[in-house]
Amino acid sequence: ALINFANISGINPTLLNAVEEINIKQLEQIISMTKQKLGDLASKKITILGTAFKPDTDDVRDSIAIKLIEKLLKRKAVVTIHDPKAIDNTRDIFGSKIKYSKSIKDALSKSQCVIIMTQWKQYKKLGNNEFNHMTKKLIIDCRRILIEKQLDVDYFAIGLGEEK
């Protein structure tokens, strides 16, 4: 939205364009990593934790998680999401194309991959007990909120996040 506004106003949004390019490359990296670990994504259950663009909001406008879900659906993945506040807004976008879970445990159940997209405090507390409900324990942490050495999973931290 800001990029479009800047372009309309005759301003070259160089920094915003760079951020957008990084976001697109991060999405490609997530898809590539998931395919490398799971193979063809068709019929694979992939759980997205967090669809809001930041914690403590239900706002999904310009959320990179929404773009990721679109890419996963194009590859025929079975997508389940959990978000403490943004489920309704996500449902407005995807309707019945994806599954919605009110509990983290249900979202993780029988999942083959979990991708953490929003830094909700609930997600920072996740550990082996929660991940044991998965059929394949592949975790892609796009916010770097989990400490790898405490987890008995295939764990990949990418993108920006908290310093560990």
Regions inferred by a protein language model and the residue ranges of each:
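Structural/interface elements that position substrates and couple domains in central-metabolism enzymes
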Residues: 1-164
